[in-house]
């Protein structure tokens, strides 16, 4: 058989992999497709296949012989890995389209998942070719299909959100990139990612969090293990800036900007959006003021906000109106008395320092309740006894 002859020829070319080829041949002859699939997953990850067109040849000379007999989503995984070895994007797209046609020809009930997985990779190739319109069309079609399905394999979601994030990154749509990248991580094991990949993604996520419209909650990102990739590198400053934003710490932010001025200037997006960044940290400073006050003290003098943010009263009013407009807070500004009554603030993910502050507030509340109870017991013993 041609497939076995091909394995034999590979054994002669790479005698050090003889055991692998013998194992693959044995499983193939016994038609143990599931076990063969698991072996192939390990095999194609070997270093010898990571350069040139070795995987392309392996696919066409061996895997094609039984491709529709194995799990079709696993076939899609193999096809995507193989497609990345094509030097020409157009050839890679044509190859993926041929695999999709084979999937459709099987008429299996669950072919939508593997097709979406492959189509998503096609979208990435289109994006790399500069065809944003076609990339967007493929992603929109994929999203519609995913929304109508249930029990979807995490790898399909991960691939979809990764390509979506790259589309938004290409267009400098920071908020959409941030959402897509976080969703990608939700369906991906961080331990399986390379250190360089984690560092690049952590950097991009951090920038998009700072620059994205209506992103005012950094707790979820800071709690994610991927952010630790920034520590001990030459971009660790970005992690500390995120911490400053999360705490609404204007003083720390300004100090970090001073110390890391050269690194900040090297990031054009940060330079271009300097005013927006200052507005955002001022808003977060306001949120920190609100959360740090006792629950019964909801009326805040504008002078306190002005002192913390180093803004004029007029600029504080603009800051409050911005916060109200993006629905970070609800309340009423009293210009006559120079105060704002805050009736609601958007919930947020709390860090350890914020949780400790909340604990202190709860302890204070418990003490007040206990004092009140003692007072009631002392003044109305008969009522309490009853």
UniProtKB/Swiss-Prot annotation:
UniProt superkingdom: Eukaryota
InterPro entries: PCI_dom (IPR000717), PSD13_N (IPR054179), PSMD13 (IPR035298), WH_DNA-bd_sf (IPR036390)
Tissue: Ubiquitous with highest expression in flowers.
Entry's Gene Ontology cellular component terms: proteasome complex
Domain called PCI: residue spans: 173-347
Modified residues (N-acetylalanine): 2
One Pfam entry name: PCI
Record keywords, A-Z: Acetylation, Proteasome
Subunit architecture: Component of the 19S regulatory particle (RP/PA700) lid subcomplex of the 26S proteasome. The 26S proteasome is composed of a core protease (CP), known as the 20S proteasome, capped at one or both ends by the 19S regulatory particle (RP/PA700). The RP/PA700 complex is composed of at least 17 different subunits in two subcomplexes, the base and the lid, which form the portions proximal and distal to the 20S proteolytic core, respectively.
Family of this protein: Belongs to the proteasome subunit S11 family.
Entry function: Acts as a regulatory subunit of the 26S proteasome which is involved in the ATP-dependent degradation of ubiquitinated proteins.
Protein's UniProt name: 26S proteasome non-ATPase regulatory subunit 13 homolog A
Organism: Arabidopsis thaliana
Gene name of the record: RPN9A
């Amino acid at each position: 058989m041609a497939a076995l002859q091909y394995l034999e020829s590979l054994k002669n070319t790479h005698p050090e992999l003889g055991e692998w080829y013998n194992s693959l041949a044995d499983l193939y002859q016994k038609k143990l497709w599931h076990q063969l699939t698991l072996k192939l997953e390990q095999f194609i990850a070997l270093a010898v296949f990571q350069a040139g067109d070795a995987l392309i040849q392996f696919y066409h000379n061996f895997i094609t012989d039984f491709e529709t007999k194995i799990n079709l989503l696993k076939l899609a995984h193999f096809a995507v890995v193989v497609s990345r070895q094509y030097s020409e994007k157009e050839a890679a797209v044509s190859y993926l389209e041929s695999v999709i046609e084979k999937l459709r020809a099987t008429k299996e009930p669950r072919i939508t998942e593997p097709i979406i997985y492959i189509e998503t990779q096609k979208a990435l190739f289109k994006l790399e070719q500069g065809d944003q319109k076609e990339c967007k069309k493929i992603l929109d079609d994929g999203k519609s299909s995913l929304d109508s399905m249930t029990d979807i394999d995490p790898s399909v979601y991960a691939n979809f959100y990764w390509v979506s994030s790259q589309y938004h990154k290409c267009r400098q749509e920071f908020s959409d990139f941030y959402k897509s990248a976080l969703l990608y991580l939700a369906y991906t094991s961080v331990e399986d990612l390379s250190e360089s990949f984690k560092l690049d993604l952590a950097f991009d996520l951090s920038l998009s969090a700072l620059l994205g419209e209506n992103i005012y909650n950094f707790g979820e990102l800071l709690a994610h293990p991927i952010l630790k990739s920034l520590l001990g590198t030459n971009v660790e400053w970005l992690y500390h800036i995120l911490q400053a934003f999360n705490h609404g710490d204007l003083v720390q932010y300004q100090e970090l900007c001073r110390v890391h001025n050269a690194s900040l200037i090297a990031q054009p997006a940060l330079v271009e959006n300097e005013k927006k960044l200052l507005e955002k940290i001022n808003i977060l400073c306001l949120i920190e003021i609100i959360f740090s006050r006792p629950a019964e003290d909801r009326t805040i003098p504008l002078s306190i906000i002005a002192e913390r943010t180093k803004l004029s009263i007029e600029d504080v009013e603009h800051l409050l109106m911005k916060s109200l407009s993006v629905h970070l807070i609800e309340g009423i500004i009293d210009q006559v008395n120079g105060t704002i009554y805050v009736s609601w603030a958007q919930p947020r993910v709390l860090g350890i320092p914020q949780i400790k502050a909340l604990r202190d507030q709860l302890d204070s509340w418990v003490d007040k309740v206990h004092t009140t109870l003692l007072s009631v017991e002392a003044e109305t013993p008969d009522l309490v006894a009853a």
